Amino acid sequence: MQPFIISAAPLQGYTTHIWRRAHHAVMGGVDDYTTPFIRVERGAVRRHDLADVAPAMNDGVPVVPQILACEPAEALLMMNELIRMGYRHIDLNLGCPFPPIALHGKGSGMLAQPERVAKLMAALASVDGVRYSVKMRLGWDDDSQWRAIVPLLDALNPVRVVVHPRIGRQQYGGEVNMPQFEQLLKVAGWPVFYNGEITRREQIDGLRQRYPLLSGVMVGRALVAHPALLSPERASADHYRTFHDLLVTGYRSLLTGGDHQVLSHLKALWQLFLPDAPARARKAIKKSTSLTAYLAAADAAISAL
């Protein structure tokens, strides 16, 4: 019997290598971390994206790099870079719902174009020695579009397919479509993971009981909001303080623009992080204009746990 896997979802701007290392070191509770997508711009793989998945920056962290592409040539360019780095498990993004991506036929926008998906699958399948996983939605503008896509994924023999049961046009609004998810789960010939609206650990147990065929789950925004979500024994203020200290140290080491740049990155985290922290502390974080003021406000927020 295959083990049930819990994976950390990629969130652009949040789950950087700094966040992943801190989470893995202090909180844990997940089996692996899928990275924010890597993409090609002006004919080259973005250096910033490659730096984020560099093995030296992810030492000891079980990482699965994710690529975003609609053209075989772009996909193969990224594959070559990742293979050169030593990666042998790579994830394909067929799920990004954001219009600037999807309206260009990438991410979930590709789900409305099965002929392009077929060409991409053929190109990826030609690469030897790589295991693939896929992150996808039910479709772009129709919740039955997955039916034309699922048979095409067989070319990759994916080790898992993570399904967010909305269509791309919904982005993160509206209800998840569990009836369509159930149908996909029944016909899939490979392991299926569920992703979407998981905010409590107990929900994972419920999903496992309801769907015996389910092979795993992927948890996203709720894990950024509550990093100890899947390791409640580490939900103390001391653990959160250590976690936050690692983020501060990481950004100070990485960024060259001084405290102002570090402050900008740390404040952005609080758009999701610890939403139940006292309003006064959260307001002080938002208004802070120096790293010293920020650190005092952040400590007040964490001390209230």
Which residues does each predicted region cover?
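Flavin-dependent oxidoreductase catalytic cores
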Residues: 1-305
